[in-house]
Amino acid sequence: MTIPLLSYAPSSQNQRVAGYEVPNEETPWRYSLEDAVDQSDIDELIWAAYRQVFSEHVVLKSTRQPHLESQLANRAISVRDFIRGLAKSETFRRLVVETNSNYRLVEIALKRLLGRAPYNKQEELAWSIRIATDGWQKFVDTLVDSDEYTQNFGDNTVPYQRRRYKDRPFNLVTPRYSDYWRDKLENSRYKWGDIRNFLEMARSVKVTPVQFKPVSTANVQIPDTTRRDRPTVPASINPTASFPLR
């Protein structure tokens, strides 16, 4: 039996208030499949989707999903389903889902899939319980199929951060994992700032003493380097040679 979603009150955020800003260089670019006229536009849309979901500016080969890209390029699936497939991919699970707590997964999912931050701690708690009961796959389907996603992005637009005009972009303040996972990795990596690491390393070094072999100089044969014979060819040096003077 699925636990019903806990109720929470939305807070006032920029995307919930009508805005009349003049578009500028800070305005996010909207990548839509309806505006794609050639393959280069499709490639830019795919790159924007990877950047939005994985929050990485460089798309790694291990991150890419060729089958999803092929289906999107052939218009066999919508952008909504492409975003869904990226968020439910095994790569995303390994890099993001397995390295974060449920509370932070809620924050990451809302920012990358709905383009907004959590309203409050009550919303984080409510969705974290949903992840614990239904799993990550079902949680992604709930967000992507929600009315909020449909009203803001529809089927053919890549999600983006809605109405950002002051704060830094989400992809700059929401790294792949937080201090929770970083502290967990502290036990398995070298920490250069701890003096105890140097002491333990020094104690673990095994020094093999050098065995010096005594040598007697009584029987050392020194070769004779004195010249006993005169050269047969006389030296061709003329002491009366003169040199031009300026």
Swiss-Prot record:
GO cellular component: phycobilisome; plasma membrane-derived thylakoid membrane
Region (Disordered): 224-246
InterPro entries linked to this entry: PBS_linker_dom, PBS_linker_sf
Lipid bilayer topology: Peripheral membrane protein
UniProt keywords, alphabetically: Antenna complex, Membrane, Photosynthesis, Phycobilisome, Thylakoid
PROSITE patterns, per the entry: PBS_LINKER
Similarity remark: Belongs to the phycobilisome linker protein family.
Protein name per the record: Phycobilisome rod-core linker polypeptide CpcG2
Species annotation: Thermosynechococcus vestitus (strain NIES-2133 / IAM M-273 / BP-1)
